[in-house]
UniProtKB/Swiss-Prot annotation:
Gene Ontology MF terms: serine-type endopeptidase inhibitor activity
Signal peptide: 1-24
Entry protein name: Kunitz-type serine protease inhibitor vestiginin-2
Primary localization: secreted
Organism for this UniProt entry: Demansia vestigiata (Lesser black whip snake)
The protein's role, per its UniProt record: Serine protease inhibitor.
Keyword annotations of the record: Disulfide bond, Protease inhibitor, Secreted, Serine protease inhibitor, Signal
Tissue occurrence: Expressed by the venom gland.
Amino acid sequence: MSSGGLLLLLGLLTLWAELTPVSSKDRPEFCELPPDRGTCMGYSQAFYYNPSQNKCLPFMFGGCKANPNNFKTLEECKRTCAA
C-alpha cells in the first residue's frame, strides 16, 4: 500500500474513532461528577458532561484544582463522556 493510501486509512480510522459514541457502560465514572469551578479565580469557558441531559454543557472554570469532569473543548467532552 502506498504512503498516501496509508495516510488516508489512518485519517479515516481517526475520524471513525472521533465519531463513535461512548456507551454508558464504557463511560468513565468521573463523567457523573457535577461541574467544579475549582479553587482558582480565573475565568475561562470549559465543558462538563451532564448525565441527566446526556450531553456536554459549558461552564466557567477557574483555572485549577477541579474534578476530572472538565474539558477544554466540547469535542473532547463528547469523545470522553457523551453516549
